[in-house]
Amino acid sequence: MVSSIKDMLKYDEGEKLEMYKDTEGYYTIGIGHLITRIKERNAAILSLEEKIGHKVKMDSKNEPIITSSESEALFEKDLSVATKSIESNPTLSTIYKNLDNIRKMAIINMVFQMGVNNVLTFKMSLKLIEEKKWAEAAKEMKNSTWNHQTPNRSNRVISVIETGTLNAYK
C-alpha cells in the first residue's frame, strides 16, 4: 500500500540493483537514479563508483550492481534534491506550499521524474493547480508529452492531483 512519497516513487520507479538504460538511453540504477547524462558505459561505471565511494561489483553477466543499502542512499539523496529544487524555485514553491500533503507528493513525483525545469513547462496545468481547479488541471496534464511517454505513471500522478487521494496506487 502506498502511503508516503517514498512508497509512491518506489512503486513508479521500481528498484533495479543492476545498471540499466532508461527510456532515454541513460544509465540508471536503484530507484530511478540517473547515474550520468553521458551515454557511455565506462563513464557511467566511473560516475557510479564515485557516488557509492568504492569500486562497483559486477554480476554474472558483467553488469554493475549495487546493494539495497546503496540504492536506498542514492534514493534518499535524489529525493532530497527533488524536494529542495521545488522549495528553491519561486514559481513552484508558491504552488507547492499551498497544496495538501497528498498533492505535494504528486508534484515531488513529477520533479523526481522530469526535473523542475520540465515541470515548469506545464504552465497552464500549474496555474489550474494553483487555482485548485483539479479536474481542469488533470485534463490539461493528460494532453502532454509526459502522459504519452509514460502513461501508466502519469495517469496515476494525474489522478492524485485530481482526487487528492492515493487510490490510483492501490
Curated annotation (Swiss-Prot):
It comes from the Eukaryota. One of its GO terms (biological process) is killing of cells of another organism. The active site is at E13, D22. Keywords: Antimicrobial, Bacteriolytic enzyme, Glycosidase, Hydrolase. SUPFAM superfamilies: Lysozyme-like. Disulfide bonds: none annotated. One of its GO terms (molecular function) is lysozyme activity. It catalyses: Hydrolysis of (1->4)-beta-linkages between N-acetylmuramic acid and N-acetyl-D-glucosamine residues in a peptidoglycan and between N-acetyl-D-glucosamine residues in chitodextrins. Its EC number is 3.2.1.17. It is an enzyme of class 3 (hydrolase). PANTHER family: T4-TYPE LYSOZYME 1-RELATED. Belongs to the glycosyl hydrolase 24 family. This is Probable T4-type lysozyme 1. It comes from Dictyostelium discoideum (Social amoeba). The lineage of its organism: Eukaryota, Amoebozoa, Evosea, Eumycetozoa, Dictyostelia.
